[in-house]
Structure formats: structure tokens, C-alpha cells
């Protein structure tokens, strides 16, 4: 077992999958930091860099799994929704963990330009993401009440009215909602077309369909499930839901333009929540809402807030440079490229 000592109290210890699983024990942990996620990352050509425990006074305070990514051919590491904190999460401990990780990465692979990881506290070494978007606030539907009536009663007033109306309007429009996790590759391609329409409407670029298919197949039905709303047999909305223990998240979703007329997305999200609650799942994370750091999510946040009385604060992602000079140069190159594309109207 490799050990990286520190002049401070903490130390970084390399773990294998079993050791990390034992360290987490029964504590809630995001799927991206658990062992099953490794198969999905590998399917995308992103191998595991390593798993580590951060120990303070011989007690495991946090664990983290990092995967190899690249940007413009420059390698970086990403610990999605990591580290998982098992003890007190203080600014000092966060900073020491980052320091230990930077030292370890430089020792193992000097090519790595930065580490992308999550932190509660902003610091000098935590920089805004060079690419992608993060969030530090979300809405989580509490499914512990168990029944649709009890779950709905815990929602805001406009949310209670909204899901009732969505159920009724979708039903009157002849919509059906079902889990289709075991669908064929050909069947999934027709479902994927809904995401193409969503991307064109909302102005983003979706992953190729193979990425979503790989997520379903590598994670398996225990950890990745697909729910689809159809009208006259045609898919109009879908949610790809991930499950880790007793917690679930709507990882990806899509809705057709036509579905707005019969409130398809809202009807589907509500049906998924009720289905998961019946199975004993305790929460459904809608994954992302606006905050002062991420105002871009205001629109989706307005929709999601109807499902929960209050937002839930989560740790946002940050870039932690391991090669600061190269990181700065990479950032300048990206900004220049974006300016050129804007000037060319592309």
C-alpha cells in the first residue's frame, strides 16, 4: 500500500476498490465515486488514475477516485462528485487534501495539467472550470414519505398543483409512462432522437448516442435505468436515472417540443419519483439549479424548485492546477479559439 506522507497531520493512502468500498461503508456516496462507475469510464476511454484515502490522526476523513481525461490533447484528472467526506470537512482539510493530491499526481505523472474535483470552500488554488459547467445547488425530492400523496404534501403549493395537473393532462393526451431499461440498441436510437430535439431547442451539444447506451449497459439496471413517456407509441420524454444505494439522480433527460402541450416532462419526473419511492429509494436528485456562481441554470432551477421546499447545497467542481504555467497557457488558447469562432460567426 503506497503512502504519501505530509508535513501536516494528514496523509494520502492509495486504495484498491475493495478498500475504498470498506472505507465508505454505509455512508451515502455518489455513484461516480463508487466501483461500478469505473466500467462506464473505461468504456469511454477514461481509465482509473487511482483511489485514495485522506487520513487525519489515523482516521479516514475522505476518499476519492480520479479518472484520466484530456482536453486539447492535454491530460487532466476528474473526480466527479468527489471527494466523499466521511469526517469533518473544513477549509484546512480540503486544502491539505488538494495539496497531497497535487504532490501525488506530480510524482506519478508529470504530464497531468490539473485536477478537477469538488470543494465546499473557495480557495486560492481552486479555479473556475476552464470548460464544462458545474453546480453548487440542486433540488432533491424527498421520497421517504413513501406514497404519492405524502410526497406531494411535502412539496411547495405550486408543485402540488403542477404534478396533479401534469398527471391529468398527460393522461388525457393518451400518454403512457414506463420503465424501458432493457430496450434494444435500435429502440434506444429512436429514444435518443428526443435528445437531439432538446439540444436544438435549448442550445447545447449532446453526446453521441453511444455514450448514453454505454452508461445503461455498463452500469446495468441496478445503477442505471431508463424511463420513457410515449404518446401513440412515439417517445416524447425520457429520464436516464442513476441509482447508488438508496439515492437516485436524474442524470440525463430529454423532452420533445410537442410534449410541452401535455406537460410531458413534469408528468414523467413525477411518475419516476413515485416509482422509486415505492421501491424504497429515499431521494431523487434533479441535479443542478441556479446559484450566484452559476446563474446560467436559472431556467432549469425555476422548473425544479416546484418539487422541493428548499434547495440543497452541494460542493461545486473546481480546477486545481498541477502545472500552473501550462494551465494558464491552455486557458489563453481556449479563449483565443472561442474569440476567433465568434468573429467567424461559427
Feature roles, as predicted:
Residues 2-17, 40, 49-50, 120, ...:
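Active-site/acyl-donor-binding loops of N-acyltransferases
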Residues 8-57, 61-73, 119-138, 146-261:
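A conserved beta-strand-loop-helix scaffold within acyl/acetyltransferase catalytic domains
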Residues 69, 91-95, 297:
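Conserved strand-to-helix beginnings and helix N-cap segments that scaffold or border functional pockets
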Residues 72-80:
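N-terminal cap/recognition module
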Residues 76, 111-114, 247, 283:
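Residues at the N-termini of beta-strands
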Residues 80-91, 145-146, 253-262, 290-292:
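A short, internal acetyl-CoA/4′-phosphopantetheine-binding micro-motif in the GNAT/acyltransferase core
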Residues 83-124:
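A gly/proline- and charged-residue-enriched helix-loop-helix capping module
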Residues 99-104, 213-328:
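Aromatic (often tryptophan-rich) hydrophobic motifs at membrane interfaces
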